[in-house]
Amino acid sequence: AAAAPAHDHASHAHDHDHECGEACGHDHSHDHEPGHVHSFPDARGIYLISPSSAVRDPQTVELARERLAAQGFKTALDRTALAEHQRFAGTDAQRLASLTRAAKQKLPIVMVTRGGYGMGRLLHLVDWKAMADSGKRFVGMSDFTAFNLALLAQTGAVSYTGATAIYDFGGKKVDDLTEALFGEVMRGELEILSFETQDADPVDCRGILWGGNLAMLASLIGTPYMPKVRGGILFLEDVAEHPYRIERMLIQLWQAGILGKQKAIVLGRFSDYKLAPHDKGYDLHEVVAWLRKTVKVPVVTGLPYGHVATKATLPIGQKVGIATEKGLAHLVLDEHHH
């Protein structure tokens, strides 16, 4: 369950011949709703910020910038992106100011260098309306889930989760699929993300796509930064969490009334954990079985998303479709109805 998917586990296409969502009884008058995918041919500029943990090796950021440049992206580094204060990338005031600068500068994409910890300290200080009004495509992962969800809860604006500078572009090699999907999503070109699923309930519906890191999601329950999404498509991942800890957070989401209101629960990768002799057969499969039995919402596994090399960049807060067939799931990001 923790293995990174092979390259053929996910594919991307520019056309499709099935309409996802008929079974949900929706009409198709959503083409001009907020959150609909638009084409962004100008998406060639990236402003890099560090709102969470400190960057310990600046060379990883330089390498990421070189690789992004090779993909045709112009990059700019925020003045405190390499700052250090304790475990953080600068003081709270410095990190908050970097978000404000990011919203005001000219480049269309704002990408975090890395996750870690620290975004939660800033949620009550951020001018969320200014973030939404900036029209920037904010993209991050892990700890940045707190920003993604707070922006959605406070404004309804769409932001992105997936690629980050250091993890995906600053390491030994760049995953081809991660790179391609990031570019396509930033340009508004990705219409369908199809991926292999070994374990999926039948589902064919539309709803708001939301989620991200499970621990961050659980940490926002009961706060003004937790979106109130009904009939959504909730996707989840986590790293270095034992299955019982994953289950405990899922129980919290369920008992808080959140899981039961969704149309589908999509599981990404839960990576880097070790089972113990005490588990005696209890593993991630048991957690998924418990989830299905208890929550009674369709569950789809295998989403290429998480703390793994091959990952999709996904829009949080956008209306999407999801459909499953034998061994495959299709996440429909852009639906054309002629």
Task: Give short role names for the model-derived ranges.
Residues 228-284:
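Internal helical hairpin/lid segments
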Residues 156-222:
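Conserved anion/nucleotide-ligand pocket segment
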Residues 35-106:
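ATP/NTP phosphate-donor binding region
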Residues 104-109, 262:
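Short acidic/histidine-rich motifs immediately flanking catalytic phosphotransfer sites
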Residues 109-120, 125, 141:
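N-terminal glycine-rich "phosphate-gripper" loop used for MgATP/nucleotide binding
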Residues 2-38, 338:
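Histidine-centered metal-binding segments
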Residues 269-338:
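ATP/nucleoside-binding phosphotransfer catalytic cores, i.e., glycine-rich phosphate-binding loops
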Residues 128-150, 158-164, 298:
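Short, acidic/small-residue loops that bind anionic groups at enzyme active sites
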